[in-house]
Amino acid sequence: MMIDRRTFTMSLLAAAAASACSSPALRPGASDPLPAFDPERGYQRREVSAGGRTVVVRAWEGLAYVSRPVEPQWQVMNLYIPEAYFQGGQIEGRTARTAPIFLPNSIGGYMPAKPGTPEGRTGPPPASGQTQPPSAIAVALTRGLVVASPGARGRTLQAADGTWTGKAPAALVDLKAAVRFLRHHDAVMPGDTERIISNGTSAGGALSALLGASGNTPELQAELQAVGAAPGRDDIFAVSAYCPITNLENADAAYEWQFGHVRDYRRIEMSMLDDQVQRREVAGTLTADQIALADALKASFPAYLNTLDLRDAAGRPLRLDAHGHGSFLDHVKSLVIASAQQALDAGADLSSRRWLRIASGRVVDLDFDAYVLAATRMKLPPAFDGVALDTGENQLFGSSRLDKRHFTAFSMQHSRVVGAQQADERTVRMMNPMHYIGRSAATVAPHWRIRHGTMDRDTSLAV
């Protein structure tokens, strides 16, 4: 079953009656109680402002959402609930029973993530020349949404005994546990647990998509039980994802299909400093060996794409020839053209975009290669499964005893690391939202909103 993600819609302001979930209890087969939640204790009152509006909220920060955390510092959430809902009040027509629950994560590069706050940024970074907008958390609160922002384990975490504790699928397990925590305490917590809206950017967008695609899947039940997650459902109402990194098994080929002709790069190196993700830009030019890898990956993409039997909204096949041209490329171009037309209609000056052809106020064509060249390459080939085991995704797919592993046959075959290992198929599969869509064992979120920046280089427009 193929789903056209761009046809999914999402309403952040939807409302519906809440359904009560189980009251606090012991997890079956365990003696440790699930984390408690008391709406009258453990919070601080604060004012949150955005867009000229101010709302008083109750803030619970550092709230554990599992009973046996592997990393207690990270497996916590920040919960913000408008005070009006404890007084029988309303915000924009929403009440304690009908307010949607906004679930933004702060995950970047599959690194460990702290819970978000009203003061911090939880959306995509602003475009060049634009000012930083208010945080999505602050905006959501002033519009009457309940906000639950979970922290999550990440790829760099290591226990004192040397065990790696944040490898795949740890972050997905944590987000699911957070959803279960909310449902577990639904009877005493304002907010509609049937209207949970996940949000994230880049790797966080990937995790948001994974959360929405894998609802209630039995594949992760053992991992959820191991950390002491609440029993019950973990499906959600809607997904909001900015430039999500998806379909990692095929993302290397997709990246070179788009960026293969771009030889210069500006890549981002990520590290952790004082529990904060640090980013540093590094510029350079591809070597001959890297170009050879790029060419091989680019050549492999059409065959994969054609196996998917993709079709546009009118039912027409979307395919590529051996050179990477065809109706699929035309379709991708049409999406960029439509976006440019929308910006033009809104008054944007696009005269500097030499790769656009504009006539009589209409965007009539796009030089795709020139457009991609203007965007520039961000990642070295292979973009995700590095042959030197040097990418964040290599570290993501490590194991409890091994820091980094390959996760594609191509990079394993071309590996530059003696003794390199390849991740098991199950782990790789669990981190691909496409695996769950169309399967009866998973409850897929009914509403999706996926956005990808015109000049975003984190992944290919194809995936």
Q: What do the PLM-derived regions correspond to, one by one?
A:
Residues 26-98:
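Catalytic-loop region of hydrolases
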Residues 184-256:
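Primarily recognizes the serine-hydrolase "nucleophile elbow" in alpha/beta-hydrolase
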Residues 97-108:
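Short beta-strand element of the alpha/beta-hydrolase
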Residues 253-372:
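Non-catalytic, alpha-helical, charged scaffold/linker segments
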Residues 107-172:
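Cap/lid segment of the alpha/beta-hydrolase catalytic domain
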Residues 343-463:
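C-terminal subdomain of alpha/beta-hydrolase-fold enzymes, centered on the catalytic histidine
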Residues 1-14:
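N-terminal secretory signal peptides and thylakoid transit peptides that target proteins
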Residues 166-187:
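Alpha/beta-hydrolase active-site loop
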